[in-house]
Amino acid sequence: MADDAVTRNRKSMDDLDFTGWNNTDWEGVFARHHTDDVVVEVHGQPPTHGIQDHIDAMKAFVESTGGTPIQVSSHPIAFGSGEWTCVVGDLEGAGRMVTVAKWTDGAIAEEYVWI
């Protein structure tokens, strides 16, 4: 049963990155895959508390990199255990990123990102 949750959460991470992030669908797909009280730590940035704080920080990050998000083209490495997942994302022309996420009821409650 736990493996089913990991599989669902990994698919949700694909949707989050490939649809929500790549298309800047902040209030739709992006928000849907996070809890309202999500805590996110992006390496080198202050942590955010709550989905709106996280969205605002990601909008600012995208603006600081030219106004278009660096596209996540694939997750060549993805695994999980219990309520946790880890994905390595290929970024078009920019290397890789890593996201470790703790899931609660199908949404990210804690997230750690290295870009």
PLM region descriptions:
Residues 1-115:
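C-terminal and inter-domain tail/linker signature
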